[in-house]
């Protein structure tokens, strides 16, 4: 299924970037909401995120992904502009999977929470090894936001979306432990 999604994502992206009017009309008529079902149990509008990802504005999409996760977590998270690790478990699985699929489809399977989680599992759940593998840290030095991150497809697998590590690993650990992934394992 993932290989099919990657191929579909690549095809859609190539058509999306083609300036030909007939192709754009075809996309509008047949795929007005893109190729990823924008499922949300809380009626979150993922179309702006989908557009940024289709345009491969990965930095803008990263910021918007956090905003959407804050919306899912509630008013307090929206106001403080970040999420407590304890709020992650209550994020709806359908929404987390939608966010992940949007990233997967727009990056040829290179980016997304599920990609990061697979890498984390492959390194024995060792966050230190994960940070190096996805280029969030080099030796003892954290990658500086935003200038040192790679905001295009030349980034290593799992590089995006970002998760703020200033408060430790608890947020990303909670994302990786979320029940949404048990449906995909």
Task: Please place each PLM-identified region on the residue numbering.
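Surface-exposed peri-terminal alpha-helical interaction modules
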Residues: 2-185
């Amino acid at each position: 299924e993932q290989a099919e999604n990657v191929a579909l994502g690549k095809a859609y992206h190539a058509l999306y970037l083609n300036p030909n009017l007939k192709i754009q009309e075809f996309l509008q008529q047949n795929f007005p909401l893109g190729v990823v079902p924008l499922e949300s149990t809380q009626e979150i509008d993922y179309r702006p995120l989908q557009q940024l990802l289709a345009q491969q504005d990965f930095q803008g999409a990263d910021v918007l992904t956090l905003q959407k996760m804050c919306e899912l977590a509630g008013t307090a998270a929206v106001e403080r502009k970040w999420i407590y690790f304890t709020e992650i478990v209550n994020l709806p699985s359908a929404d987390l999977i939608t966010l992940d699929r949007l990233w997967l489809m727009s990056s040829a399977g290179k980016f997304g929470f599920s990609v990061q989680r697979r890498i984390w599992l492959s390194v024995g759940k060792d966050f230190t090894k994960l940070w190096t593998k996805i280029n969030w840290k080099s030796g003892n030095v954290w990658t500086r936001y935003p200038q040192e991150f790679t905001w295009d497809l030349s980034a290593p697998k799992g590089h995006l979306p970002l998760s703020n590590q200033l408060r430790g690993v608890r947020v990303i650990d909670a994302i990786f432990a979320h029940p949404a992934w048990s449906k995909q394992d």
